Amino acid sequence: MGKKNDNTLVKNASFLMIAALISKIIGMLYKSPLSNTLGNSSMGLFNYAQNVYFILLMIASFSIPQAVSKIMAEKLAFKRYRDAQKVFRCALLYVIIMGGVVALFCLFGSSILVPESMSGARLALKMLAPTIFLSGILGTFRGYFQAYRNMLPTSLSQIVEQCFVAVFAILMSAVMLNKFSGAEESVRNAWGAAGATMGTGAGVASALLFMLFVYWVNRKNIKKRLARDTHSRDEATSEVMKNIVLIVMPIILSSFIYNVNGFINSYMYSGIQGFKGLDHDTITSLYAEYGYYMTLINIPLTLASTAPTSMIPEVSAQYAKRDMGSARDKIDRATWISMFISIPCAVGLAVLAGPITRLLFPRTEGAAAQLMMLGVITIILNGNSNISNGVLQGIGKPNIPMINAAIALVVDVAAMAILLLATDLGVYAIVVAMIIYAVVMCLLNERAMKQYMQYKNPWRSAYLNPLLASVPMAVVAGFSYYGIYKLIHSNFISLGIAVVLGVIVYFIVYLAVSKPSDEQFAMMPGGAYLKKIAGKLPL
């Protein structure tokens, strides 16, 4: 039984990891033609609107899939299908109300959310109001199927969403720029950014239609379950709503505190730089460079966090049984897979920052690459803190990461203010503040993990071995890129060869220094295939 559960866990983690990776790659690839279409100023406005949208979405419905799947799973464990269905209906009511309120605030409160120096982003933000409303409904349907341990609909809907986002963002931004081609540049930039945000709406709408279709296909099975249910207690709607709110609100609060630093940093950057006399176009252009950096940095971070996060329920289960040894072992596994991905990605992005940003974002003026080289450490730090956040929440200590995040936020804001007012770092101050925030978060969470679980990070297996393998990888990738580029002067071909050679070297050296177990191979992306290759190598 335990092996079956482990297999299901790995399979669900694989679905989510692959979908997250594909979604992020699509998101990265479409940003390249989008930035070419919009230009840096309009792209900066688009990025700012998306940043504010993310915070509003977090308040409206960010934790709904998690809450729905958790409460429904508790009912389904005892075959209380009607009670589970009532949770689903009440969750829909919750997101309709909350999503509606937040969407209205987005529509009519844009002047509060966006500073004057970024006023061109207000129109784009207003365009995102309907998307906030629809996102909550989409999240509820995703949580419904996750409760049944079926991650495939969620995974496919994420890919569908990103495909529609990519197509419609590029299409509508071009349409809007053409429509307002004769207008002032500031007006044209604002409408270009607004057109790009229409892609986000199209993506959410398409994913929602997909989930509705999946639900419709399964309607007969759903009705059969409800008909044969003899275990449900037919809980009052008010009680179900109360349970949803009690689970959702702490998650929203902690997630808000954990993620709001990005919004605050952006708001402070644009506001203080405007106060210091920097012109509007320079502020938005540099913010576009920051957006390019974030687009690239989020791919390895998402990939490194998805699978470990899906393993956290196993930690909770072992902790509940007071089996601390097994719980610590699960955390070691989650940390190992996260660092196995995070560390080489961070090193590789630092070494090839210039070629990558020039390939994907031809309009970059070079700042994105410099931001990348400065900020890649956040991939490793955030990968670590994402796991510790999940563990502390999973063992019944949700207030601890929330308090730690609040402390880190205060330090972040203070550092950001000093850096912007006392130095000329400008947009680089955002990345420095992000690093400071992540370091504080990691240190505080690690202290809590030691206190409540006597846990110590597996420094050698999780951190040192990937780092040792990443050093020769970086040398090979760097020398091969610049050597090949000198011969053929093709950034694309040189970069492709360098990345492939770097991955091969990393894998071979990692096998030599680490000698991963069968269990570790099973957790790797494409682990079965990699194990076969490893068996043929003389190591």
Predicted regions and their residues:
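Membrane-interface helix-loop junctions in multi-pass transport and translocation proteins
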Residues: 152, 163-214, 399, 409-443, ...
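N-terminal membrane topogenesis motif
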Residues: 1-26, 82, 86, 231-258, ...
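Helix-loop junctions and terminal segments of transmembrane helices
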Residues: 62-77, 301-321
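Membrane-proximal transmembrane or re-entrant/amphipathic helices at the cytosolic face
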Residues: 479-539
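Interfacial/gating helices of multi-pass transporter permease domains
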Residues: 34-55, 189-194, 240-247, 270-297, ...
